[in-house]
């Protein structure tokens, strides 16, 4: 399987992780992705555990921890829209909190 690795400075971690999370949530909100996507993307413990050493906010960590609950809410018949909007609003705050001097340079590496 071909893989893609994205590299950026740790000081931009909050912005990029919040951006990725927001994109996935918007996809779920629009119906392009299922709620189950949360479990298999950013909701995976292996992903969240990697973030423990990064300088990211408690708000962002809380949103990421909620990713694995989205499918369960759907199975319980609970409307996801309010939860998704709350999570997206939190991610908006995370994105806006970036230091204006932080480098947003990103490097992509493709590997077999």
Task: Provide a role label for each language-model segment.
Residues 1-112:
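Acidic, Ser/Pro/Thr-rich low-complexity regulatory regions
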């Amino acid at each position: 399987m071909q893989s893609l690795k994205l590299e950026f400075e740790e000081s931009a971690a909050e912005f990029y992780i919040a951006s990725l999370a927001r994109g996935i949530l918007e996809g779920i909100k629009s119906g392009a992705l299922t709620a189950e996507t949360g479990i298999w993307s950013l909701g995976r413990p292996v992903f969240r555990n990697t973030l423990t050493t990064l300088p990211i906010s408690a708000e962002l960590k809380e949103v990421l921890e909620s990713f694995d609950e989205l499918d369960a809410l759907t199975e319980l018949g609970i409307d996801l829209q309010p939860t998704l909007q709350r999570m997206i609003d939190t991610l908006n705050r995370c994105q806006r909190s970036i230091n204006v001097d932080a480098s947003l340079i990103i490097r992509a590496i493709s590997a077999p």
